């Protein structure tokens, strides 16, 4: 099998601290895989182990059907792009891009590769400049070009855009996506692994996303699946902005129908399709998850609504994000500005939860509860 396979990969430091716990992951040839997670989740450590910059304690890393545990970084056919660019300040852009090829192929081939990559990255006019004369975005494109000319089997990116301003990050993000598509279209090696803590980057760039927490894979899936079908409470909370509303509630009944109690805020009856997920669940409480776009604002006395008080309203231009207090619980609602709803902090309103879209999580372990058919 081509691509990259990680088999029970562990990282244990001499002091006994275990950073990675039995990582099993298969990355397909030509796939754009994103590693995402909070600071300290070991996503960069895992990337550096694939690159050969960090030793492996246990397990096996396979690249293109070859175990590379004992293979030097320069012989793994990977190219890494770092956050800090790592350019030689005394060399021109041209020489920075050509440096890794010097002495390995004819000058004509080196020149062709450098100029071709520079044209694709729109930096041909910068080839005779030095890094000190470039902007951050230009430096990052040079670093990317330096990786491209090597024609590696795998591109590794370690938070390469985090030093750039917001507008430039968007531009570079699109450029990386286009580069990946272009390499695939030309039949060139295009497997990419991208590390970020920014979930927007993860959701917009990755074919699949690997979510990590404390050195353990929480879920590997397509972006849309992670958003709509999180495997556990951690993924539900981490993916999505604003974050999913998560609240521990008591399982009860209301007129004989399964319901959830929000203590002083009242009860909400569960739709039959959602209530079916509780079959076999024996705990008295459960964690309810609901996305902000599935929290609907209505009047304070509306039937089936939770009484709430507006705390803060974020006017985003195209949408409104409303933070509310519901008997001591924090809820966030999100809706288009075109609806014309306006309110002030302190106003009493009602929140209707679209429970058909609810997620239910085990109160003890945080695992999602799914219907028996799933």
Q: Where on the chain are the PLM-derived regions?
A:
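ABC ATPase nucleotide-binding domains
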Residues: 77, 87-234
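Conserved post-Walker A/P-loop segment of ABC ATPase nucleotide-binding domains
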Residues: 54-62
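Helix-to-loop junction immediately C-terminal to a conserved catalytic motif
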Residues: 51
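The feature captures the beta-strand-to-loop junction immediately N-terminal to the Walker
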Residues: 36-38
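Non-catalytic connector elements of ABC transporters
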Residues: 242-244, 254-374
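ATP-binding/catalytic-site motifs of ATP-hydrolyzing domains
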Residues: 60, 66-67, 216
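ABC ATPase nucleotide-binding domain helices that frame the ATP-binding cleft
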Residues: 44-47, 142
């Amino acid at each position: 099998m081509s691509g990259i396979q990680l088999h029970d990969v562990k990282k244990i430091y001499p002091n006994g601290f275990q950073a990675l716990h039995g990582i099993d992951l298969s990355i397909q040839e030509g796939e754009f895989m994103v590693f995402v997670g909070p600071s300290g989740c070991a996503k960069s450590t895992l990337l550096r182990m694939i690159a050969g910059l960090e030793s492996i304690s246990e397990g096996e890393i396979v690249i293109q059907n070859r175990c590379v545990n004992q293979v030097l970084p320069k012989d793994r056919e990977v190219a890494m792009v770092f956050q800090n660019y790592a350019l030689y300040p005394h060399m021109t852009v041209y020489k920075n891009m050509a440096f890794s090829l010097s002495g390995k192929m004819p000058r004509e081939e080196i020149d062709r590769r450098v100029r071709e990559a520079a044209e694709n990255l729109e930096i041909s006019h910068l080839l005779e400049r030095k890094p000190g004369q470039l902007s951050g975005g230009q430096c990052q494109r040079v670093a990317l070009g330096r990786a491209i000319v090597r024609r590696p089997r795998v591109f590794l990116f370690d938070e390469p855009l985090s030093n750039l301003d917001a507008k430039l990050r968007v531009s570079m993000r699109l450029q990386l996506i286009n580069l990946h598509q272009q390499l695939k279209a030309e039949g060139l090696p295009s497997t990419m692994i991208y590390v970020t803590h920014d979930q927007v980057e993860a959701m917009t760039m990755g074919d699949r996303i690997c979510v990590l927490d404390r050195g353990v894979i929480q879920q590997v899936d397509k972006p849309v699946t992670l958003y709509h079908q999180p495997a556990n409470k951690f993924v539900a909370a981490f993916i999505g902005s604003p974050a999913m509303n998560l609240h521990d509630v008591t399982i009860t009944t209301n007129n004989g129908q399964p319901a959830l109690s929000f203590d002083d805020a009242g009860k909400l009856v569960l739709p039959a399709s959602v209530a079916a997920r509780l079959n076999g669940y024996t705990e008295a409480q459960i964690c309810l998850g609901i996305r902000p776009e599935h929290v609907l604002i209505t009047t304070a006395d509306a039937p089936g609504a939770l009484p709430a008080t507006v705390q803060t309203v974020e006017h985003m231009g195209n949408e409104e994000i409303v933070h509310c207090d519901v008997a001591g619980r924090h809820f966030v609602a999100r809706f288009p500005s075109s609806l014309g709803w306006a309110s002030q902090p302190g106003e009493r309103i009602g929140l209707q939860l679209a429970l058909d879209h609810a997620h239910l999580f085990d109160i003890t372990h945080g695992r999602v509860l799914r219907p028996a058919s799933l």
